[in-house]
Amino acid sequence: MSKANVGINGFGRIGRLVLRAAVEKDTVQVVAVNDPFITIDYMVYLFKYDSTHGQFKGTVTYDGDFLIVQKDGKSSHKIKVFNSKDPAAIAWGSVKADFVVESTGVFTTKEKASAHLQGGAKKVIISAPSADAPMYVVGVNHEKYDASNDHVISNASCTTNCLAPLAKVINDNFGIIEGLMTTVHAVTATQKTVDGPSGKLWRDGRGAGQNIIPASTGAAKAVGKVIPELNGKLTGMAFRVPTPDVSVVDLTVRLEKPASMDDIKKVVKAAADGPMKGILAYTEDQVVSTDFVSDPHSSIFDTGACISLNPNFVKLVSWYDNEYGYSNRVVDLIGYIATRG
């Protein structure tokens, strides 16, 4: 079977890393990129050099309005570059880009993202939470994808992708009565380098490199959309911290069935080695955040950081590269829906 042809709208952090993940995984073919704010020579530069993930271990050049991305042992990608501000005006069909990754952060509703369908795309995957598009988390609920009705879908958030696999394993084995999540989250592009105005969210406007910033996140509540039996049982918040990448979920839950920490470790390890292999990982090492830069998993369970007050009340800790792990799941989700017709 031929590989799915993919277009990327928005060549920012996630757009570029989706392309890196696509090259590395070699399961989809990227045929187009649209970004109205970046010239093609600048795209080459931004893709080649990355302060967080390092220099691209291959070659990237351009020929006319095509990006050429190559890496030894992997398929090469000849990528048509568009520069349209209007998603409806991008000629995805001209390069047979059936699947479009919407990674601008702007067109996150079904109505806005469906503009890509006018240009010839068949499916749109929003690389962010969506207010109304169905959300799929690979390894958790991706098999509920409905090819005949789901033309615009969301890959949820990086934090939901970390939390949901862990919550599913714990809920399936022990039952979750209720829980609170905190994500200690790396900085992202929406934050300020120094103090500045930030609409109604005043704290978000404080200097990202100087502060631990409490922030809201819908990631825990979104798990209830992905795992319906947990709807209304989880909520959470975030602390933005001055690190460039890698975040960590702290999930504190009350369990229906009592469980020792060893019981919990066993079921998480079984899932990581079995049905969630490649999505959920498991470590007993004395790790810190930089150990997970460029880690392709959604969630890496840290046994040494977990604690238990009693067999029904536990705190569980799981790491994630909020950029690269998430981008890998975007590619996996496309690979899956491409097989569903």
Curated annotation (Swiss-Prot):
List the GO biological process terms: glucose metabolic process; glycolytic process
Q: What class of enzyme is it?
A: oxidoreductase
- Assembly state and interactors? Homotetramer.
Origin: domain of life:
Eukaryota
What EC identifiers does the entry list? 1.2.1.12
Alphabetic keyword roster: Cytoplasm, Glycolysis, NAD, Oxidoreductase
Q: Site: Activates thiol group during catalysis. Where? A: H185
Q: Where does D-glyceraldehyde 3-phosphate bind?
A: S157, C158, T159, T188, T217, G218, R240
Which pathway does the database say it acts in?
Carbohydrate degradation; glycolysis; pyruvate from D-glyceraldehyde 3-phosphate: step 1/5
Annotated GO MF terms: glyceraldehyde-3-phosphate dehydrogenase (NAD+) (phosphorylating) activity; NAD binding; NADP binding
The text of the family note is: Belongs to the glyceraldehyde-3-phosphate dehydrogenase family.
Cytoplasm keyword on record: yes
Q: Which cysteines are joined by disulfide bonds?
A: none
SMART domains in UniProt: Gp_dh_N
Record's subcellular location:
Cytoplasm
Q: What is this protein called?
A: Glyceraldehyde-3-phosphate dehydrogenase 4
Q: Which organism is it from?
A: Caenorhabditis elegans
Q: Name the chemical reaction catalysed here.
A: D-glyceraldehyde 3-phosphate + phosphate + NAD(+) = (2R)-3-phospho-glyceroyl phosphate + NADH + H(+)
